[in-house]
């Protein structure tokens, strides 16, 4: 399903984010950038240990990434140029609004890097425990608010692993984003 927001194409799709062609892939990360399981583990397995090594170096230099913020590394063997590590909230621990903040910061970082396309997973829905619909609301809100200000980013892919995630996100995005078409 495709949407258009402020001249930016937003594509909701099922799939494996490590296989997507985009200038940047967003990783659902923890503050210490230790990429063990879920999307983070898959990104390191597919992209190579260099992503984990660069992440540890980033934390050594800058300290842990605050919830709602991002860090950037190379993408190793992935098709992307960069991995933008976005730290979303743990539901029930940190405010859900930090998820929208993380998405906005990921989009703005990609814009700062002059990128054209970015792929986002369902941040905070894995071990961080946020329900798909709540995460989708935060992500749709962030995209709707930031997209009109983007100049280099022309395409945002929201890549969902599994049918349940896709259906929940589709339901929410249809409500919050204009111009949905198959």
Curated annotation (Swiss-Prot):
Lineage: superkingdom: Archaea
Annotated ranges, domain Macro: 1-177
InterPro entries referenced in this protein's UniProt entry, alphabetically: Macro_dom (IPR002589), Macro_dom-like (IPR043472)
Pfam families in alphabetical order: Macro
Residue ranges that the Swiss-Prot or TrEMBL entry lists as coiled coil: none
Entry protein name: Uncharacterized protein PAE1111
Species of provenance: Pyrobaculum aerophilum (strain ATCC 51768 / DSM 7523 / JCM 9630 / CIP 104966 / NBRC 100827 / IM2)
């Amino acid at each position: 399903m495709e949407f258009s927001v402020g001249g930016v194409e937003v594509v909701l799709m099922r799939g494996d984010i490590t296989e997507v062609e985009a200038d940047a892939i967003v990783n659902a990360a923890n503050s210490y950038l230790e990429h063990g399981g879920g999307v983070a583990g898959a990104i390191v397995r597919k992209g190579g240990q260099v992503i984990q090594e660069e992440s540890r170096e980033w934390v050594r230099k800058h300290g842990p990434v605050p919830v709602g913020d991002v860090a950037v590394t190379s993408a190793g063997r992935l098709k992307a140029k960069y991995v933008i590590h976005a730290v979303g909230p743990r539901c029930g621990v940190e405010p859900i609004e930090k998820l929208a903040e993380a998405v906005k910061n990921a989009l703005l970082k990609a814009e700062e890097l002059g990128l054209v396309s970015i792929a986002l997973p369902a941040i905070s829905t894995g071990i961080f425990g946020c329900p798909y619909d709540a995460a989708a609301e935060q992500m749709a809100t962030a995209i709707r608010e930031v997209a009109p200000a983007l100049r280099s980013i022309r395409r945002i892919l929201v890549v969902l692993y599994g049918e349940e995630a896709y259906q929940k996100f589709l339901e929410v995005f249809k409500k919050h984003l204009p111009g949905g078409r198959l």
